[in-house]
Design a protein with these regions (language model features):
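Core residues of folded domains in eukaryotic genome-function proteins
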Residues: 9, 55-57, 195
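P-loop (Walker A) phosphate-binding loop of NTP-binding proteins
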Residues: 16
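Conserved P-loop NTP-binding catalytic core
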Residues: 25-89
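Phosphate-binding P-loop
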Residues: 2-8
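Hydrophobic anchor at the beta1->P-loop junction of P-loop NTPases
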Residues: 13
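Conserved lysine of the Walker
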Residues: 21
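Beta-strand elements of well-folded, non-transmembrane domains
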Residues: 8, 61-65, 97-101
Length: 215
C-alpha cells in the first residue's frame, strides 16, 4: 500500500521523471470520476496475484466535528452518530475495481465506507438495512423505544439499536454502499466531496474542453 498525505492549503509533488507523480494525480481523477484519464485493465500492476486482481484507490477526508448531514429524508444526523468514521474520526472511502475480466466496466467497481464499526453488526451494517428490517430488529431484540420516538426515520431505529447494544466492541468494517439506505447515504456524502480537476500540461488546453467547461 502507498499512503500520501495532503494538507488543506497547498501541496506540491516533486520527483524525478517517470517515478509516478502523474500516477498520483490520475488516481485521484479516477476516484473523483473526473473522466480525464480512463481506468483500464493495463493499470493493474503486472505482478498482481491471480487471487487478488483488484485496483484499489482510497481517499480519507477530514470531517468537521458534529457537522450535520441530511442522510435520512430530512432528518439531520452526524457521521459520528451513524458510526461511519474510521478509528481516527475521518471519513474513509475505498473504491475497488475487479480486474479478473478482460476489461474494466461500470460493473467492475465496488465502493465501500471503511468505518470503525460495531462488531455485533459487522456482517450486516445497519445502514444497509431497510426501515422495515430495522423496525423488525428492534422488536426481535426487545429494544424499548423512548417516549417521543420518531418512527418516520431509519436513523431513529439505528440509533435505538446502537444504544441497546451491550457489547460495544468495534473493528474496521468495509461497508458496501451498493444497496438499501447505504446507497442513498453515499450519494449525499458524494455531494460533499471536493471538486477535483486534472489539467494535463503535456496537451493543449482549450476553453471548450469538457474539464474546463464542467470541472
Amino acid at each position: 500500500d502507498i499512503i500520501i498525505d495532503f494538507n488543506g492549503d497547498f501541496n506540491t509533488i516533486i520527483g524525478r521523471n517517470d517515478v509516478g507523480k502523474s500516477t498520483i494525480l490520475e488516481a485521484l481523477d479516477v476516484f473523483f470520476d473526473g473522466g480525464t484519464v480512463p481506468l483500464t485493465i493495463d493499470d493493474l500492476r503486472v505482478d498482481a496475484p491471480l487471487a487478488d486482481r483488484n485496483i484499489v484507490i482510497g481517499v480519507t477526508f477530514k470531517v468537521e466535528p458534529n457537522k450535520q448531514y441530511d442522510l435520512d429524508a430530512g432528518n439531520l444526523t452526524t457521521l459520528e452518530n451513524e458510526y461511519l468514521l474510521d478509528k481516527d474520526g475521518n471519513l474513509q472511502i475505498e473504491k475497488v475495481w475487479d480486474c479478473s475480466s478482460k476489461s474494466i466496466t461500470a460493473r467492475s467497481l465496488s465502493t465501500f465506507i471503511v468505518a470503525n464499526y460495531f462488531s455485533a453488526y459487522a456482517e450486516a451494517p445497519l445502514i444497509t438495512q431497510t426501515q422495515p428490517k430495522l423496525k423488525g430488529l428492534c422488536e426481535t431484540k426487545g429494544v424499548v423505544l423512548p417516549e417521543g420516538f420518531d418512527g418516520r426515520y431509519s436513523s431513529s431505529y439505528r440509533n435505538a439499536l446502537y444504544k441497546h447494544l451491550l457489547d460495544k466492541s468495534t473493528k474496521e468494517v468495509k461497508i458496501s454502499i451498493e444497496k438499501e439506505d447505504a446507497k442513498k447515504i453515499y450519494e449525499k456524502l458524494h455531494n460533499e466531496f471536493p471538486i477535483f480537476a486534472l489539467f494535463q500540461a503535456d496537451r493543449q488546453n482549450k476553453d471548450t474542453d469538457k474539464d474546463i467547461q464542467d470541472p
